[in-house]
Swiss-Prot record:
Signal peptide: none annotated. The gene is mutL. Belongs to the DNA mismatch repair MutL/HexB family. The keyword DNA damage applies. It comes from Buchnera aphidicola subsp. Acyrthosiphon pisum (strain Tuc7). SUPFAM superfamilies: ATPase domain of HSP90 chaperone/DNA topoisomerase II/histidine kinase, DNA mismatch repair protein MutL, Ribosomal protein S5 domain 2-like. NCBIfam families: mutl (TIGR00585). GO terms for molecular function: ATP binding; ATP hydrolysis activity; ATP-dependent DNA damage sensor activity; mismatched DNA binding. It holds the Pfam family MutL_C. The keyword DNA repair applies. SMART domains: DNA_mis_repair, MutL_C. This is DNA mismatch repair protein MutL. The lineage of its organism: Bacteria, Pseudomonadati, Pseudomonadota, Gammaproteobacteria, Enterobacterales. This protein is involved in the repair of mismatches in DNA. It is required for dam-dependent methyl-directed DNA mismatch repair. May act as a 'molecular matchmaker', a protein that promotes the formation of a stable complex between two or more DNA-binding proteins in an ATP-dependent manner without itself being part of a final effector complex. Keywords: DNA damage, DNA repair. One of its GO terms (biological process) is mismatch repair.
C-alpha cells in the first residue's frame, strides 16, 4: 500500500482518541474551558452516563461570534501566542485541541455570548464532515452552553469497550469531584437523567475551605485532618493531612494539585509517606495538598490529557513537601505525647522481656566490635535545612554562592569543584556531611530537641556493674532520647532516638550499651562519634543539588570551620603551577 496523507476526518478521529477516551474526558475538557473563561457557576447535565448527551452551561466570558467557528478547529486557542508562553501558563488549556477533538467524535452544538454581543450565536457540527456550517443567532445570557450528543456515534469500536455505563458515570462524578476540590470559589452542579447528583456551593472564606471536603466526602469527619500551609523555596504548599494519631479507619483519600491542576504524582506521595514514617507507621494516609509553583519550573506539555507534569527540580519539590508535612506532624507528636505522658501508664503495652546478655568480658569485647551495616536508604538532604533565609528569593539555587564559594561540578561522585576569589578548591562531600551531622546532633542535644520514638517497655537484665554504669550515665543518655526507668535489678527502656527507628534497633542498642560498658564513662562527643560511625548512612552518589545543600549547611551550622578548614575537608588546587607547565 503506497504512503498517502490521511483524510482530515480520519486523522481528526485518530488524534481525538488520545484526548477523548470516554465521557468523563469530555466533561473534564469542557469544565476546564469554563474555568479558563472565568465562570462562577458551572452546571453539567448528563443523559445515559454521557453517551446520549452531555450539556454544560457556564457564566464565563463567552466566545465572540466571529471566533465561534474557529474555536472548534484544531490548534485554535486564545491562551498562547508563542513558544515562550508555555513557561508562563496559568490556564488549563493551551493546545486548542479540546473542542476540535470532541467535535470529531460527536454531534456538537456550541452556543455562546459575550458582554459585547447583542445576541448569542449557535453552531451545530457533526464531526469534520460538516459543510456549510451556519452561524445562527439565538437568545442566551453571557456565557457558553456546550451540548455533546451521541458520543462516539462514528466510532462504534470505541463504544464496545465502554459497555459499563455505571462505571462511566462514576468516572464523570470523580472528574467533577477532583476539579471542585481545587476551585472553591465556583458553584458546581451535576445532574444525571434529570436527577441532581451533586451540588457544591462556592466558598468565599479561606477558613471555610475545609467545608468543600465535607461536601465532597460526606462521611468524612474533618476533625481527623490537619490544615497545613508552608512557604519556602519560592513555592507554597497548602492543604490538609490526616491526623497521625487518629486510629479510626478512614478513607484513603489522596489528592495532589499543582497550580490547581489535579495529578497523581509519585513525588507528592513519596514525600508525604516519608514524613509520616518518621512519626508514626500508618498504612492509611490521607491528604489533599495544593502546590503553587512558578510556571517555568514545570512542564505540563508531556501528556495528551495533561494528567502528568514534569518538575525541573524534583529534588527541591520533594524536600519542600517533606519538610512542610514533617514539621506539622512533629508539632502534633510533641503535643500528643505530652498529653499521653500525663496519663497513668496503665495503658502501656505489656512489658516485653529483653534479656541483654551475660557479663562475660569476652562477649562484651566481641559485640562492641560489630558494626551494624544498614542498606543505603535514599534521604533527601534538604529536609535538614530548617530556615527560609538560606537562599535569597531572587537567587536561583544553582547560582547560589556560599561563603566557601560557588559549586561548579561534581568530581568522582564524592568531591565538588569550588570556585572562590579566583581560586579553585576541592571539597570532600562525605567529610563535610559528617561534620554537619555531628554538629547538628550536638545542637539538638544542647537545645533538647531530640525527637524520641516511644517503645513498648523493654526490660533489660544487667549485672550490678552494668547497672551502675547506666545509672551514672542516665542524664547524658536522656539528652539523646534514651529514657531509662531504673528498677532494683534491671532497667526498662521506654524510648530511643527517633533516628534509630528504621534500624534494627535491638542490635544497635546492644552494640551501643556494650560500647558504654567498655568505656564506663562517656561524653556527648563520644556518643555523637559512635552514632556517626555505626548508624548514619554515607551517600555514595552526590548530586549537584545535594552538594549545594551541604555548602549551605556548613555555612549555617559550622561558620567557624570556614576560617581554618581541615585539610581532609578542603584542598586548594594550584592552577597557576599547572598553567606555568602548560604555557607555551
Amino acid at each position: 500500500m503506497p504512503i498517502r496523507i490521511l483524510p482530515s476526518d480520519l486523522s481528526s478521529q485518530i488524534s481525538a482518541g488520545e484526548i477523548i477516551e470516554r465521557p468523563a474526558s469530555v466533561v473534564k475538557e469542557i469544565i476546564e474551558n469554563s474555568i479558563d473563561a472565568g465562570s462562577k457557576n458551572i452546571n453539567i447535565i448528563v443523559e445515559n452516563s454521557g453517551f446520549q448527551s452531555i450539556i454544560l452551561k457556564d457564566d464565563g466570558c463567552g466566545i465572540d461570534k466571529k471566533d465561534l467557528l474557529l474555536a472548534v478547529c484544531h490548534h485554535a486557542t486564545s491562551k498562547i501566542n508563542s513558544l515562550s508562553d508555555l513557561d508562563k501558563l496559568t490556564t488549563f488549556g493551551f493546545r486548542g485541541e479540546a473542542l476540535a477533538s470532541i467535535r470529531a467524535v460527536s454531534r456538537l452544538t456550541l452556543i455562546s455570548c459575550t458582554r459585547f454581543n447583542d445576541v448569542a450565536a449557535k453552531i451545530y457540527l457533526e464531526g469534520f464532515c460538516s459543510k456549510n456550517i451556519i452561524l445562527q443567532p439565538i437568545a442566551h445570557p453571557e456565557g457558553t452552553t456546550i451540548i455533546v450528543d451521541n458520543l462516539f456515534y462514528n466510532i462504534p469500536v470505541r463504544l464496545k469497550f465502554l459497555k459499563n455505563k455505571k462505571l462511566e458515570f462514576s468516572k464523570i462524578c470523580e472528574v467533577v469531584k477532583k476539579i471542585a476540590l481545587s476551585h472553591f470559589y465556583i458553584n458546581f452542579s451535576l445532574k444525571h437523567n434529570n436527577k441532581l447528583i451533586t451540588q457544591y456551593n462556592s466558598i468565599n472564606n479561606r477558613k471555610n475551605k475545609i467545608n468543600r471536603l465535607k461536601d465532597i466526602f460526606d462521611t468524612l469527619d474533618t476533625s481527623e485532618f490537619l490544615e497545613i500551609k508552608e512557604k519556602k523555596y519560592r513555592m507554597v504548599l497548602f492543604g490538609w493531612i490526616s491526623h497521625p494519631y487518629n486510629f479510626k479507619k478512614i478513607k484513603n483519600i489522596q489528592y495532589c494539585y499543582v497550580n490547581n491542576r489535579y495529578l497523581y504524582n509519585n513525588i507528592f506521595v513519596n514525600a508525604v509517606r516519608a514524613a509520616y514514617s518518621k512519626i508514626e507507621q500508618k498504612k492509611n494516609i490521607s491528604f489533599v495538598l495544593y502546590l503553587t509553583i512558578e510556571s517555568f519550573n514545570i512542564d505540563i506539555n508531556i501528556h495528551p490529557t495533561k494528567n502528568e507534569i514534569k518538575f525541573h527540580n524534583p529534588d527541591v519539590v520533594y524536600t519542600f513537601i517533606y519538610e512542610a508535612v514533617f514539621s506539622y506532624l512533629k508539632k502534633i507528636k510533641e503535643k500528643y505525647y505530652f498529653n499521653f505522658s500525663c496519663k497513668k501508664q496503665t495503658q502501656l503495652n505489656k512489658e516485653k522481656e529483653f534479656y541483654f546478655y551475660d557479663s562475660d568480658p569476652t562477649f562484651l569485647t566481641l559485640i562492641s566490635s560489630i558494626f551494624f551495616k544498614k542498606k543505603q536508604i535514599f534521604k533527601n538532604i534538604k529536609n535538614k535545612i530548617k530556615h527560609n533565609n538560606f537562599i535569597s528569593k531572587s537567587t536561583p539555587l544553582e547560582k547560589y554562592e556560599s561563603s566557601i564559594g560557588r559549586l561548579l561540578i561534581i568530581i568522582h561522585k564524592y568531591y565538588g569543584l569550588i570556585y572562590h576569589d579566583n581560586n579553585f578548591l576541592l571539597l570532600s562531600f562525605p567529610v563535610a556531611k559528617g561534620i554537619v551531622r555531628k554538629q547538628k546532633l550536638k545542637n539538638n542535644i544542647q537545645k533538647e530537641n531530640i525527637i524520641e520514638y516511644f517503645l513498648s517497655n523493654i526490660k533489660i537484665n544487667l549485672t550490678s556493674q552494668e547497672y551502675l554504669i547506666l545509672f551514672n550515665q542516665k542524664e547524658i543518655l536522656s539528652k539523646f532520647g534514651f529514657h531509662l526507668i531504673f528498677k532494683k535489678k534491671y532497667v526498662i527502656l521506654s524510648s530511643i532516638p527517633a533516628f534509630l527507628k528504621k534500624c534494627n534497633f535491638h542490635i544497635i542498642i546492644s552494640n551501643f550499651f556494650a560500647f558504654l560498658f567498655l568505656k564506663k564513662q562517656v561524653f556527648i562527643s563520644d556518643i555523637v562519634d559512635w552514632f556517626y560511625i555505626n548508624v548514619f548512612i554515607e551517600l555514595k552518589n552526590w548530586t549537584y543539588i545535594r552538594g549545594i545543600e551541604v555548602l549551605l549547611e556548613i555555612e549555617y551550622y559550622c561558620p567557624l570551620l570556614l576560617i581554618n578548614p581541615p585539610s581532609k575537608l578542603l584542598q586548594k588546587i594550584n592552577i597557576n603551577a599547572a598553567l606555568c607547565i602548560l604555557k607555551i
